[in-house]
Amino acid sequence: KGRGVLCIYCLIGKSESALNKVLQLLEEYGALEYTIVVAATAAMPPGQQYLAPYSACSIGEHFMNKGGHVLVGFDDFTRHAWIYRELSLLLERSPGREAYPGDIFYLHSQMIERAAYLLEEQSGGSMTFLPIVETLQGDVTGYIPTNLISMTDGQVYLSTALFSEGFKPAIDLGLSISRIGSKVQWPAIKELSGMLRLEYLQYRELEKLARVKSAGGEEIEKRLRKGRIVTELIKQDKNRPVPLEEQVVLFYFFRQGKLDPLSLEEAKKFKATLAERVLKEKPDLLKAIREKKTLTPEIKEELDRLIQIASDKGWLQEKGGA
């Protein structure tokens, strides 16, 4: 929102109620102003469902060729593959693995290749794809998921188990991969979160061991406590993404070790009230981070002053803050 990006949401083979839920959500947050919805529900003919993503691509290309920036979300490619399999079997084409036709990989790879970033002399527009695929009982080695993984610049894997534990968004950091990663991150985020993924994965392994082995030393307890705080910091409430500049401030406090003495409840409270407190004490800091996108000496100095203010005003006290 407010970034000059046109969004296209393409729904394939899902129910009318699922479509209405998405439309209601987009309308509630004012996203319909910059979003085009291309929908072919399960009640529509198979041919229409098959053509829906191609229609979304063509609409996106129209705006890309005019110099615009487009994000296309496909919900989802699993159902599109099912529809193509159904049509192919009706046409008596030879079935292959899992009864899919032999050109199922070509079908999706050809579509993915339409995403591009054009040169300035060719309008300078861009189109980014965000395809969604369902997994069967969390198996990412299925035919369609592995096909898509081989085509894209990475994947975000959402785990049912993590969702049940209350970790939302339920992103499995072990199975989620980015092939471009830090190249597209803000330098500030890259500097502060470089080791965060490894630290979190080590915490998850340590937590599993701690469940089996009750005895643990002081160092183990310290690492577990720090891991729980990391887990709390990377959680987000539903439909409430945390702006990157707020993440920079939050992880700066964490990297300076200022959150280590906090209990889990106090860490939650600190995270929930941080943005409001920063705007009150340092109204220009978030704007400066958003514009510079890097931890300049001036921004670090302001962040250090903010830490001092936090200490003086009791934000970091374990039993209640200002």
Residue ranges, per PLM feature:
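Phosphate-binding/switch loop-helix module in NTP-utilizing enzymes
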Residues: 48-84
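Well-ordered alpha-helical segments embedded in enzymatic catalytic cores
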Residues: 18-21, 52-55, 59, 107-111
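Short acidic, glycine/serine/threonine-rich loops at helix termini
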Residues: 19-24, 48-52, 82-88, 140-145
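Conserved helix-loop functional segments at active or binding sites
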Residues: 21-29, 58-65, 86, 113-117
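Short, ordered loop/turn segments at secondary-structure junctions
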Residues: 11-15, 40-44, 76-78, 135, ...
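Loop/turn-to-beta-strand initiation segments
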Residues: 4-6, 33-36, 67-71, 124-129
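Conserved catalytic/coupling modules of large nucleotide/cofactor-utilizing molecular machines
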Residues: 62, 79, 89-322
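Phosphate-binding glycine-rich loops and their immediate beta-loop-alpha structural context
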Residues: 1-41, 45-53
